[in-house]
């Protein structure tokens, strides 16, 4: 029996990248899945997982819109019955210098990376409180709260905010049986990382990914499935005494003082 057998997990931004990795990992550990994404293509992933014998429901919603989120969750619960686990994974990153970034681009990050998490959590949490049981996994980043790169001010702002939200919710709802923990990935080989590489060097994005890997002590980017395993641990009873934590999964990238000094 898998560590998530009998549990139903709602995963946002589940179509690709880390979200897809979490979905596939949770399915392997026995969870019933509700896959939420803004793209109707999420139906294809749900169909694939169902075809492999997993229980899976796809819902299309825009996390920026509370009404859209509420309607999607209502549809999902009509089929799945309840939500035991929430993974707030949906997020975006657009590069741009602080002075050149438009208010629209700033708000694009805030609306999805902060307000989207707020909206989904607010829609799911009351049911968890009523049952006095729930696990919430927040997708933050090493960027923002620990390190920063030029051109990622808006992204860093929002991911640091998720750490604060994680800790606040963990304290506020600990006695309601709710555990809230954050994952802080370094670079993961995802469409988002590839987009950052294209924005950094449109003519040779692969070289950017290569340089990313060189700066990591383990000399590679993470696989989304590796982040999925950490999320599964935080969503399972194996982490029953963990709440309000930041769980770094970065191959050691935040450890070196510099990449130019040493043996």
Swiss-Prot record:
Residue sites binding NAD(+) per the record: 10-32
Keyword Oxidoreductase recorded: yes
Source organism per UniProt: Escherichia coli (strain K12)
Binding site for substrate: 141
InterPro entries, per database record: NAD(P)-bd_dom_sf, SDR_fam
Keywords of the record: Oxidoreductase
Annotated family: Belongs to the short-chain dehydrogenases/reductases (SDR) family.
Pfam families: adh_short_C2 (PF13561)
Protein name according to UniProt: Oxidoreductase UcpA
Active site: 155
